[in-house]
Amino acid sequence: MFMYPEFARKALSKLISKKLNIEKVSSKHQLVLLDYGLHGLLPKSLYLEAINSDILNVRFFPPEIINVTDIVKALQNSCRVDEYLKSVSLYHKNSLMVSGPNVVKLMIEYNLLTHSDLEWLINENVVKATYLLKINAYMINFKIDLTVDEIIDLVKDIPVGATLHLYNILNNIDLDIVLRISDEYNIPPVHDILSKLTDEEMCIKLVTKYPMDNVINFINQDVRYSPTFIKTIKDFVNEHLPTMYDGLNDYLHSVIIDEDLIEEYKIKSVAMFNLEYKTDVNTLTLDEQIFVEVNISYYDFRYRQFADEFRDYIMIKERRQITMQSGDRIRRFRRPMSLRSTIIKKDTDSLEDILAHIDNARKNSKVSIEDVERIISSFRLNPCVVRRTMLSDIDIKTKIMVLKIVKDWKSCALTLSAIKGIMVTDTINTVLSKILHHHRNVFKYLTSVENKEIAVCNCSRCLSLFYRELKSVRCDLHTDDGLLDRLYDLTRYALHGKINQNLIGQRCWGPLTEMLFNENKKKKLNNLMEYIKISDMLVYGHSIEKTLIPITDSLSFKLSVDTMSVLNDQYAKVVIFFNTIIEYIIATIYYRLTVLNNYTNVKHFVSKVLHTVMEACGVLFSYIKVNDKIEHELEEMVDKGTVPSYLYHLSINVISIILDDINGTR
């Protein structure tokens, strides 16, 4: 089948014939082009139609004609701001900044505001400084004044690092506040104000409470050189060896002469104080051996010959190897980062790169249609190729050449692929094309039933079921029947527009979101399933509904690193719907194998899972055959975390049948 339905291909042909000028095609074709994302930048005349089709189309209009409220809606529906949405947002920045605290929060998360913008917001009382600090304290690098109550309220809600940054930007910070925060919230008082503290006993308590945080550097100079203070800190350091506190060691090195340190600590002084000391590994005491091994990374840096000799000594004496640990003790502090960003990581060979290459080749020599078709074939499953091509900077003749190829793309429905030695029909292309063809019909259906109570629902699919109540109200999740009953209820809820995107503690890890939204899941499957034992997989019966969200509230553009890879909101949510059903299938099977440790009759159980899902969707007379080799594949999935390709194939067959049933094309 063609990737695009016939009416979409016809509309695209008309657009090509009009030299890609969308204003010159009929209004009927314009609406089709908007629905399928077959356009580039848009004219003012199509504003209302485009916004009604998808709010993120706002980014494709000239900024001067855009309504600020539409930009706000677009920001709310995004996870990343691409160059187009960023451009229109910055054009209307002043208006957006006074559109309310929630809009300001979005702009901060998308890095659309500068430090001077934030300073203006605070000075003009548009938003409170505390509100901005709770969003991202590091964004504010200018001096501010806060009351004690405001400071304490902030400290409750921001990380330790943000609190330490707060200390540096406050005009009215005082010793009492810093000590109170340390006492009540265990945040180290690392600020110059601490030097005003002259109570030696209190200073000792603070230094020993935060030995890793270099509080010692802020202690009053008179206290630092007090013999009692020096002795107490030295005793504390000795008490905790072989654990080392670099800041305290540096302090001791600054107040005690090298000769005395070497005499007391000997080989330990190399790691503790970076002093030179030579000795024979054969003369080390047991205590020294333990210390050297624990802190071998220091010796790797400061006395490599000794470190090598010590490793050889341990290998010969104890027949074990001390691994290289250099750099383990380097401490790295990272500021918290927002999930949102204006930065999009570019693939090595993106579509835009390839289009530019084709364009350059056309200018220098004749390029055949076959060559172009071959070089862009890897983007066959991407429903946004047309839009990205039209938005690119290449010559219009090159754009038309590419669009003519894309218009006639077909899914490889009859391609045979070998999966784990099994010859199966490759259905993934067909399913993706089906979703592209019918996503609006499926979305319309899901939203029409999402408010119905499934136990009393009288929709056509529920009326055809043998069992319409919740099956898992009284179930034993240690049995196959219990797992299948819960799966039945989960799937029925999904068919009524309510899904759990976080069933196993991970969101959107299935094959459809991975392929369509450029979600690159490097983690092995067994790592993704790490928290399955304490996840929503334990929920059943009436409690299931509490874990669900309406499909209309599901993440859509927020799945993708690059919103340009998502066709539109409805399409994304339909993909999420089918992807979630596949996740239910995989998670149920994985739970039986790993949590219940039940490997009996695996093939039969997989078959039951697949048919339970179809039955819950009102598909009662379809059969999917499961090959014996599924058992070996699932063993590898559990043991090695490998992707269960054949199980994915079976699951995609299931959603293909369900899609056809919803769309009325079975």
Swiss-Prot record:
<feature type="transmembrane region" description="Helical">
    <location>
        <begin position="574"/>
        <end position="596"/>
    </location>
</feature>
<keyword id="KW-0472">Membrane</keyword>
<keyword id="KW-1133">Transmembrane helix</keyword>
<keyword id="KW-0812">Transmembrane</keyword>
<dbReference type="Pfam" id="PF04497">
    <property type="entry name" value="Pox_E2-like"/>
</dbReference>
<protein>
    <recommendedName>
        <fullName>Protein OPG074</fullName>
    </recommendedName>
</protein>
<dbReference type="GO" id="GO:0016020">
    <property type="term" value="C:membrane"/>
</dbReference>
<comment type="similarity">
    <text>Belongs to the orthopoxvirus OPG074 family.</text>
</comment>
<dbReference type="InterPro" id="IPR021155">
    <property type="entry name" value="Poxvirus_E2/O1"/>
</dbReference>
<dbReference type="InterPro" id="IPR006732">
    <property type="entry name" value="Poxvirus_O1"/>
</dbReference>
<keyword id="KW-0244">Early protein</keyword>
